[in-house]
């Protein structure tokens, strides 16, 4: 149903945000070195 679709989209968005944050952290670390 609609609610499961919303939850799935939220989960995907959270995963994408976590990946982006991790990549940003790696970039910042490599800049600092």
UniProtKB/Swiss-Prot annotation:
One of its GO terms (biological process) is defense response to bacterium. Keywords: Amidation, Amphibian defense peptide, Antibiotic, Antimicrobial, Secreted. GO terms for cellular component: extracellular region. The modification Leucine amide is found at residue 33. Pfam families: DD_K. It comes from Pithecopus hypochondrialis. This is Dermaseptin-H9. InterPro entries: Dermaseptin_dom (IPR022731).
């Amino acid at each position: 149903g609609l609610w499961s679709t919303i939850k799935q989209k939220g989960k995907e968005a959270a995963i994408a945000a976590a990946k982006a944050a991790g990549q940003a952290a790696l970039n910042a670390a490599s800049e600092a070195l």
